Amino acid sequence: MSYIIDRRLNSKKKSMVNRQRFLRRYQQHIKKAVSDAVDRRSITDIESGESISIPTRDISEPIFHHGSGGKNNRVLPGNDRFNGGDHIERPEQGQGGGGNGSGASDSGEGEDDFVFQISQEEFLNFLFEDLALPNLVKRQLAGNEEFEFRRAGISNEGSPGKINIIRSLRSANSRRIALTGKKRRRLKEVEAELEILEPESAEAQALLAEAEELHAKIKRIPWLDDFDLKYNLHVKHPLPTSKAVMFCLMDVSGSMDQATKDIAKRFFLLLYLFLQRNYERTEVVFIRHHTSAKEVDEQEFFYSRETGGTIVSSALKMMDDILQTRYPASEWNIYGAQASDGDNWNDDSVICYRLLTEKLLPKVQYYSYIEITTRERQALWHAYEQVLSDFPNTFAMRQLQSAADIYPVFRQLFQKQTT
């Protein structure tokens, strides 16, 4: 009978296994609560834990119990009103018996919700479940630091932990056979002659002495020698890595009011958390633009108050310049995400179309554009519609009207593709 011992380290919480089973069972309720939390949270509080409320009726278990009809003989404790043989009127259907609830209600019934807390780790797991960067491919990089060990046969040297017992014993057995073969053949001849001769004869005594000497020589051969030890050989092979770079392009022009900028920042913060959590080797390039574009760090990207006019092509040109100098397409998976309110200088939308179709999209794996506006779509949106028709597999565009649209649109843009 086989026994499997799970030696994986568990957390300090003794009920972790039951908790994980509970989270899997009610993941639909939790996913909805996580989605609602993203809509109402501030930018700085988007990655903390969350209190999840599940209606009691959804976690109730089916049970067997007596129905309200039929005739039953029961012993009721605490009876001070009836004697044996008294007839008790049957209550009407639906009456009698107290219920549980959360206070007064005009509906006549109610139950408290079951509320529990999920950690930051669990919150982010549900937040980014089934999401992935589209079209991510393996690329062999110069100076690659990732390796894996592969079997490469047998070696005569190695660490004790890699010793190959079967090969070592086989080698020892072969050595003993090779070194004692001549002696064993002579020993067989001597034993055959001894069976013919008289035991007391002088010739037999000489053969016995020779046989004893042969046995002693055979025993002197070591059973296992250092030369017999064989080790499993493992060699390092470089691995192709999925290094990726994400360009975040945000419009901070004067037409973007504070509410629109907050929606854009929340979208990019969600994207940034997703990349940092799921892809360790992903670099992020932040570009803010109005009439001119500027590469900034994370702090300035999310919290700078600089503003101005609107020339979207300045950000696309800067992205192309950075690609040429730092991120060659042959070695990097390149992604782009752009957020704007759609307002642009009149003739600049045509320039944006040319930059995307001629320079950027042939190099990138995926490029997404979100337009944050409740107004009618303008020239930039229509120009990007032409881009979408030319590159349907690597370009995507969505419209956001409020903060409630951020998470659903984010999941649409980065939904894991099934092949």
From Swiss-Prot:
Pfam families: DUF444 (PF04285). It comes from the Bacteria. Residues 63-111 are annotated as: Disordered. InterPro entries: UPF0229. Residues 83-92 have a biased composition (Basic and acidic residues). NCBIfam families: PRK05325.1-2 (NF003707), PRK05325.1-3 (NF003708). Belongs to the UPF0229 family. This is UPF0229 protein TERTU_3150.
